[in-house]
Amino acid sequence: TLSWPAFGSSGNYVISRGGSRLATDFVAVDSTSKLTFTDTKANVDKYENYYRINRNGISILLSLENQIFGDNMYFYDRKYENVEAARNEINSHFSAIGRSGANGEWTTKRQAYYFKKNVKGQTYDPGGTGSASSPTANAIELGFYAHIGGLGKVPADVKLGAIFTRPHLSGGANATCTFWRSMENVAVMRDFAWTVSQSTSARRMLIESTSKYISDVGTNNFWGSGGFFADTHYSSARPNWGGQQQWYTRNTVFPSGTGAMGGSYNMVWQGCINPPAADNANSPIATTPIIREKPFLFIDDDGEYKVFVPAWQKDRVGVSWSSATMGKGKIQDLLADWYVAKEGDTDVELNNALKAGKNIFFTPGHYALNAPIQVNRKDAILLGAGIASVTLEPTEKNKWGCIYADDKDGIIIAGLLMDSFNSTTYQIRVGGEDANADHAANPILLTDITCRVGGVQSKNIEIHASMQINSNNVVGDHFWLWRADHGTQRGGNARWLRDRCKNGLIVTGDEVTLYALFAEHYQEYEVLWLGERGRTYFLQNEPPYDAPNQASWSSQGGRVNGYAAFKLANHVKEHHSIGMGSYAVFTGTDGNVNKSNGFEAPNSPKVKLEKMCITRFSGPGNIQNVINGIGGSTATGVKRVALYTNGDGKQPYDEEFDLPNRESYPVRH
């Protein structure tokens, strides 16, 4: 039975039914003066009943999918729609709200586009020729804060044509601000031009075409600052990353070969089949020691919406799925096991759902919090779609943070952007300061997490750390921790005083493993690691652009210029990292600001840092050494250190670290 509010001035409501939102088969099924209607001849699949209610030229659309998922999720079904319907709508959104330009970079709009399984003999590819950037390619253009997901069990269940992410800087040649978009669980049949930088995730994909991949912008001068790619199979050709500064690729299969695949400074390939051979820029790593893939939404054989939660795997090589099977994991019923959150839901509603034993699926939107989301039970999951944002609002009611997770087994936090318009201690914290549980059998997973400080707010804010990991056995799979280097507000010294945040990440837990860590522009140590037996596979960093002068930006009692991008405390006895880059861009200073070391670590036999790189992109200042006073300065170009362990460098001075304190935590209700 349908019901709707009164609208239109007079006459009956004319009711038409179609099999999907953009269906070509809408037919009139009734006309009534009432505000309700019972369809006695509905389609058998309850999700294949969309009703258009029309009166006096005004029309509304009702469906169960819209009732469950809200207005920011769009579903496509080739059983009922023309092949070009999805592409045309997505591209119209891309154009209408400026997603190709700087205005789109700061929009509060969020969208997710979900494709139902291919109908036999049909795909979502409207056909086309040429590279994805060409108008003749008929590509889907995916913009800011948008997500594409396949609702099949395996990527080949949903076949798309060409995909393009259009850069908006330097006439389309510069993708260094092409942020905040994602794709998963689909096949791309033609050109896949994923021309992106940070906070962009492409997972669980099948790339069937001969794809130029990252450099398809019609120019030889392209550059980008990506990126992250995982659990994907290239079936036809080895792609090329072109002018990417760096990239992290995990558990991906490429056609045979060992040749270079583009990129400039720091390309890490972990658990991949047929990666490039090792050289200065390329770091192939044989296996992924421990990983759990990100959960995802799909439609099961019974026609119901489910969430697949992949299992933990150790020492993995290649993808987690096959052409016929989803892979190892568990299936959860969305309506029975999950609370589906919609924009406007409050922290009270979200926390009540968690207390009731529900996991939370965040539909795309902007979630304003007056108190943190408190994840306080084993195996709880927070899963965002469409770059859903959980936000500290400027009301100052929430001075604690966006998400606090307790020291519990199996917690998953995925696909969320933490934003701040107010001062706080953290944006996200995992485990209290007294966390000491052993989670080795069922670790905590953080995946596709973005923390953003500044960029849009006009008031002064102060945050101690974007993220603090106190629990042991946490696995992080793709973070961008970002104190904004640009935005809608005035920069320079004003930004240094307005957007204050000391640390991007503080790790106090033991046996923490991080893949694809991006941390930029924080005002002190960008990554501060205090725990033992940690592992870091890939780091990308730029120091703050806007330190006014050297006196305002020095560490270790003023004895050291600036702060290292990655700081292992002197007491740490064991750590292993591979593939770390820090790049100087001191453009907002007095012209005399330098950083002494890209990285700092204790001289200990079991502290091993491999494949470190520093260079200068812009501005007069330099990074003066790679690590611990050795490796050379960016004043004379790119500098690299292949291995540092118990090395020849000078161990940093001992220091006490200013850590956030427990008194700032909220009262647990």
Question: Can you describe what each PLM-predicted range is?
Answer:
Residues 7, 38, 62-64:
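Disordered, low-complexity "stalk" and linker segments at domain junctions of extracellular
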